[in-house]
């Protein structure tokens, strides 16, 4: 109760100019129409960036879609360590100072980067995590609340903002922005656990890095 007494947080300053930003969209077997909406949304974010499709499905049609939309296509010969391994492999092939991570169904708003990169004025900020929200209301996530709420809202709108007050929010993967240097300093995304984002959070905090929570919905996915 004490942790969640005040969930208001100071909004960051506008971001510095000239930051280099990569956008990672890990995918495996998602429908092309879903992936297309995400790529278009990522391309429409206003801060300069490069969008990468990380395709563990190694699909020709995904490569063609990425090429058509002006995105870069990356793949690898195996699927070792699943999503964590996919992101770690992409780290080796890219160079942006900051990385926005979007699930294949997560469509960001145009101001996503403008509202999150400002947190990185603090040199100890490793990750900015945002709430997960969904544009469909017919899923199991909405079984009890219908169109009014889904089962993760307590976590994303009460617990995470409260943990932000004590400098202890979790990285939840998507949607988020990551400082490359911080992630590389702990060996990339953790591969020793199926909850790789949570374990990576612990490693970052243990090494003096901070995670920030931006309590505003700036991306929508499918539940």
Where are the regions that the model predicts?
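Active-site beta-to-alpha loop of glycosyltransferases that engages the nucleotide-sugar donor
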Residues: 23-39, 57
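N-terminal membrane-anchoring/stem segments of glycan-assembly enzymes
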Residues: 1-17, 66
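Cell-envelope/extracellular polymer assembly enzymes that use nucleotide-activated donors
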Residues: 19-22, 50, 184, 199
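A conserved acidic beta->alpha catalytic loop
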Residues: 55-62, 78-79
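Active-site donor/metal-binding and catalytic loop motifs
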Residues: 215-223
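Long helical/loop segments within the catalytic core of UDP-sugar-dependent glycosyltransferases
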Residues: 74-98, 110-194, 199, 203-206, ...
């Amino acid at each position: 109760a004490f942790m969640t007494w005040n969930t208001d947080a100071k909004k960051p300053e506008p971001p510095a100019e000239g930051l280099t930003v990569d956008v990672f969209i890990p995918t495996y077997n998602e429908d092309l129409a879903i992936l297309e909406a995400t790529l278009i949304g990522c391309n429409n974010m206003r801060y300069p960036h490069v969008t990468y499709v990380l395709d563990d499905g190694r699909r020709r049609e995904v490569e063609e879609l990425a090429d058509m939309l002006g995105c870069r296509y990356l793949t690898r010969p195996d699927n070792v360590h699943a999503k964590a391994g996919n992101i770690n492999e992409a780290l080796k092939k890219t160079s942006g100072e900051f990385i926005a991570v979007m699930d294949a169904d997560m469509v960001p708003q145009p101001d996503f980067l403008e509202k999150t990169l400002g947190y990185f004025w603090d040199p100890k900020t490793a990750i900015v995590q945002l709430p997960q929200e969904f544009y469909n209301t017919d899923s199991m996530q909405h079984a009890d609340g219908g169109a009014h709420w889904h089962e993760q809202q307590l976590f994303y709108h009460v617990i995470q903002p409260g943990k932000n007050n004590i400098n202890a929010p979790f990285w939840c993967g998507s949607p988020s922005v990551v400082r490359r240097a911080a992630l590389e300093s702990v060996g990339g995304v953790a591969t020793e656990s199926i909850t790789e984002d949570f374990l990576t959070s612990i490693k970052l905090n243990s090494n003096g890095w901070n995670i920030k929570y931006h309590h505003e919905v700036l991306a929508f996915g499918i539940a």
